[in-house]
């Protein structure tokens, strides 16, 4: 008889390895960036002539930013994971749906208002040759390809889960699989499942199947969303770490704390619904929380080598930003917002649906305002 342990997929460790490769691959690529500015000057040249260019103050701000952003990330992603102890914040509650909608709005605005504009700025920079970069909208094209590729990966990963899952063949199996959480000790471990159940109802096979399909889908969402977040977090951290512009770094720290906290809440809600074990939750929390501080530290280490307006850096960072934007757009609209708003919880409660819409607008609006400084 298959227990819920057999339903733990093989792909999460692979996804974790991909996250490591994404972060590590940026080191040789960005270290190869040209030390000389192709535009004929040093980066942050406008600030270099004024009070904004202050290397010691910039270093202090960046050293403060690393633990501050780390703590904000940990708090944001862990709040939903600790919500089971608070009845009002449990995943089946209305407040959880509203908070998740707010966080989804933050993720949506991150893609549209922060990451995609940066990609356009990178790939249309005057530091790049006019041909082909100014003659074709590469940022939009790569974002579109990334969204379609995310759909393809989402579909293929879900197919993998569905084909590799065990199928319950008896009432006892149904009762065992009905408990799809992390602990196989719960539910009918004795496997009788005759329906009298000592007051416990045995789930119907169709209900169990639907529950398991949704669980597998939630796990796919977590993996794909985390990859997109990691990519743009490393890029943002790298830019902050390499900059010597105090006027840019100071507001960026505050904006990144806001961004990481609420983006973490969205990711944490998805992790909670995916019902991963403690080890996998820890891995996902670790990668989300440390990627931006890692990017800042990487930027500090490459300050003398990395030039953010060299052609190599502009192309690499611009393409990564465009791909990340397409992924975030798809995940926010399709997997998070559409899935929740078309689901039975919000469809069955108009008041809750309106509250969730308002939360999306507030989250997206707040993150859009942050685009003025970051």
From Swiss-Prot:
One of its GO terms (biological process) is cadmium ion transport. It is found in: Cell membrane. Residues 34-62, 114-137, 241-251, 304-313 are extracellular. Residues 1-33 form the signal peptide. GO terms for molecular function: zinc ion transmembrane transporter activity. Expressed in companion cells in the upper region of the root. Residues 84-92, 159-219, 273-282, 335-353 are cytoplasmic. Its main location: membrane. GO terms for cellular component: plasma membrane. Keywords: Cell membrane, Ion transport, Iron, Iron transport, Membrane, Signal, Transmembrane, Transmembrane helix, Transport. Residues 179-188 have a biased composition (Basic and acidic residues). It comes from the Eukaryota. The chain crosses the membrane at residues 63-83, 93-113, 138-158, 220-240, 252-272, 283-303, 314-334, 354-374. It is a multi-pass membrane protein. InterPro entries: ZIP, Zn/Fe_permease_fun/pln. Residues 166-199 are annotated as: Disordered. Induction: By iron and zinc deficiency in roots. Plants overexpressing IRT1 show enhanced tolerance to iron deficiency at the seedling stage, elevated content of cadmium, iron and zinc in roots, shoots and mature seeds, and are sensitive to an excess of zinc or cadmium. Iron transporter involved in the uptake of iron from the rhizosphere across the plasma membrane in the root epidermal layer. May also transport other divalent cations. PANTHER family: FE(2+) TRANSPORT PROTEIN 1 (PTHR11040:SF220), ZINC/IRON TRANSPORTER (PTHR11040). Belongs to the ZIP transporter (TC 2.A.5) family. This is Fe(2+) transport protein 1. It comes from Oryza sativa subsp. japonica. The gene is IRT1.
């Amino acid at each position: 008889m298959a227990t819920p342990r057999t339903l733990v997929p093989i792909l999460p460790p692979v996804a974790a390895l991909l996250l490591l490769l994404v972060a590590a691959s940026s080191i040789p690529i960005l270290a190869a960036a040209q030390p000389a500015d192709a535009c004929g000057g040093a980066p942050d040249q406008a600030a270099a002539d004024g009070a904004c260019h202050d290397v010691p103050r910039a270093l202090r701000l960046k050293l403060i930013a690393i633990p501050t952003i780390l703590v904000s990330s940990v708090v944001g992603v862990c709040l939903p994971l600790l919500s089971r102890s608070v009845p009002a914040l449990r995943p089946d509650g209305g407040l959880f749906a509203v908070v998740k909608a707010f966080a989804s709005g933050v993720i949506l605005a991150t893609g549209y208002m922060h990451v995609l504009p940066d990609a356009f700025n990178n790939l249309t920079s005057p530091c790049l040759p006019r041909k082909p970069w100014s003659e074709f909208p590469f940022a939009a094209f790569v974002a579109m390809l990334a969204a379609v590729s995310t759909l393809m990966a989402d579909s293929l990963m879900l197919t993998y889960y569905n084909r590799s899952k065990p199928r319950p063949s008896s009432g006892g199996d149904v009762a065992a699989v009905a408990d799809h959480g992390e602990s196989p000790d719960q539910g009918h471990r004795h496997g009788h499942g005759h329906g009298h159940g000592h007051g416990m109802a045995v789930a119907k096979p169709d209900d169990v199947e639907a529950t398991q399909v949704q669980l597998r889908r939630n796990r796919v969402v977590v993996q794909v969303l985390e990859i997109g977040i990691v990519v743009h977090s490393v890029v943002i951290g790298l830019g902050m770490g390499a900059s010597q512009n105090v006027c840019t770094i100071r507001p960026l720290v505050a904006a990144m704390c806001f961004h990481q906290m609420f983006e973490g809440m969205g990711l944490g809600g998805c992790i909670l619904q995916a019902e991963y074990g403690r080890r996998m939750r820890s891995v996902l929390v670790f990668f989300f929380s440390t990627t931006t501080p890692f990017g800042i530290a990487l930027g500090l280490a490459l300050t003398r080598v990395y030039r953010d307006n060299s052609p190599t850096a502009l192309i690499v960072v611009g393409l990564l930003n465009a791909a990340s934007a397409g992924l975030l757009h798809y995940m926010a609209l399709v997997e998070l917002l559409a899935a929740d708003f078309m689901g039975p919880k919000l469809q069955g409660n108009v008041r809750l649906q309106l509250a969730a819409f308002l939360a999306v607008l507030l989250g997206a609006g707040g993150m859009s305002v942050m685009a003025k400084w970051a």
